[in-house]
Regions:
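Active-site acidic-Proline motif in GNAT/NAT acetyltransferases
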Residues: 86-88, 92, 120-121
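Conserved acetyl-CoA-binding loop-helix of GNAT-fold acetyltransferases
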Residues: 91-104, 130-131
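Conserved GNAT acetyl-CoA-binding A-motif
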Residues: 106-118
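Short, charged/polar, Gly/Pro-enriched secondary-structure boundary elements
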Residues: 153-160
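Well-formed, non-transmembrane alpha-helical positions, independent of function
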Residues: 17, 127-128
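Acetyl-CoA-dependent GNAT
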Residues: 3-81, 86, 101, 105, ...
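Conserved acetyl-CoA-binding loop of GNAT-fold acetyltransferases
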Residues: 129-139
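Conserved beta-strand-loop-alpha-helix junction that forms the acyl-donor binding cleft
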Residues: 116-126, 142-144
Length: 162
């Protein structure tokens, strides 16, 4: 199944599919809707890296990173900003694919770690991120716990498909 997954740029042709993605109801307070993420990306184009996750011809998720190498807070040098997997597509490895793809992009950019922040507690994504190698740092951004995952910078990867 994972071989069918790919990341695509958000375009005029697929923006409606992006905005139609909905997480489970118990997750709605934990991650911003895709439309909000796209507004953030529009206002911060120099750092935002938004991508739709496709399985075949169907949009099944959305991932957005921030790459801000000059930011005073190193968390934002390579940061998993948003991850929205459609409710009916969760538990199928799509989130893992998105995070691993983002790690590849971060490594291609020469980064040594990927950061994420999340709401901890019931229904929160902490367990998911820990299974992917993220460890809490003890820091918080607003009311979200920060976790990091080490990555190894690699030679340039062909990211033209992303």
């Amino acid at each position: 199944m994972l071989a069918e997954l790919r990341l695509e740029l958000v375009t005029q042709q697929n923006v409606r599919a992006a905005c139609a993605l909905k997480v489970r109801p118990d997750q709605e307070g934990l991650v911003a809707p895709v439309a909000f993420s796209l507004a953030d990306a529009y206002t911060m184009p120099d750092i935002a890296w938004p991508r739709l996750i496709y399985q075949g011809d169907q949009a099944v998720g959305f991932v957005m990173a921030a790459f801000a190498p000059d930011h005073q807070n190193p968390v934002y040098h390579s940061y998993l900003w948003r991850l929205n997997i459609g409710a009916e597509h969760q538990g199928k490895g799509i989130g893992r694919f998105a995070v691993e793809s983002l790690c590849q992009e971060a490594a291609r950019r020469g980064n040594h770690r990927l950061s994420v922040s999340y709401h901890s507690g019931q229904h929160g994504p902490e367990g998911f991120y820990r299974r992917l190698g993220f460890q809490p740092t003890g820091a918080y951004i607003q009311d979200e716990e920060v976790a990091e995952r080490p990555i190894s910078p690699i030679a340039a990867v062909d990211s033209a498909r992303w």
